[in-house]
Amino acid sequence: MKIEKFVTSGKFRLDGGEWDVDNNVYILGGKGGVYIIDPSHNAEQVINEVGDRPVRGIILTHAHNDHCELAPQLGEHYGVEVHLHPEDDELWKESNGDAPYVPLTDNQQFELDGEKITVFHTPGHSPGCVVLHLPQDNVLLSGDTLFNGGPGATGRKYSDFDVIIESLRNVVFNLPGNTKVYPGHGDETTVGAEAARIDEYVARGY
């Protein structure tokens, strides 16, 4: 499976605040089309990156506005479904009102050219956070659950530090250590590099 990354820039809004942010958007491609992961900020940029390839669907790792607010527009543009874990429904409604989405479930699988994309529910940064595992490519799209240097932020509403640590210990860090981690923001890392720092995360509290 071909994994493409590009960066978009815009605003993250939550709890009455607003911050500048750069987001990693991913396109998972094959002969059978593409899936768009977390399209953000700039619809024209996303459409240009996709080009004339058929879109199979849009998969969201969570429903903070910087990851999800383009999804209804792009879903309509391409005539495809938007997939989101329902535990993030309240956050989704803050950005997108009653726009429809298809609920994701833990261990759900998508397929592209015979290769699997497996969804793991990893709450903590938000209640409905998920990561996407591509075992054939030894890659994890971690959204905002895990970054190079630490877990996703848990200082805002609907987030919980103890829960994200549990998700890392019980789900993410059970994957092979050489699994490449492609996060929602910033640079890549590996499962092993971050698992080795779990005690540091816990000690510092973020």
Where are these regions (language model features)?
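Conserved beta-strand hairpin/beta-sheet module of binuclear metal-dependent hydrolase folds
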Residues: 2-53, 131-143
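Active-site-proximal loop/helix segment associated with metal-binding centers of metalloenzymes
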Residues: 5-27, 93-99, 149-150, 198-206
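Short, flexible loop segments at the rims of nucleotide/cofactor-binding pockets, characterized by
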Residues: 11-17, 34-37, 58-61, 118-121, ...
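Active-site HxH/HxHxD metal-binding segment of metal-dependent hydrolases
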Residues: 21, 34, 41-116, 196-200, ...
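Active-site neighborhood of phospho(di)ester-bond hydrolases with catalytic His/Asp-centered motifs
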Residues: 36-38, 56-63, 82-86, 121-124, ...
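Short, glycine/acidic-enriched loop or turn micro-motifs at the edges of active sites
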Residues: 41, 65, 88, 124, ...
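Pocket-forming structural segment of enzyme catalytic cores
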Residues: 107-109, 115-131
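Metallo-beta-lactamase
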Residues: 127-206
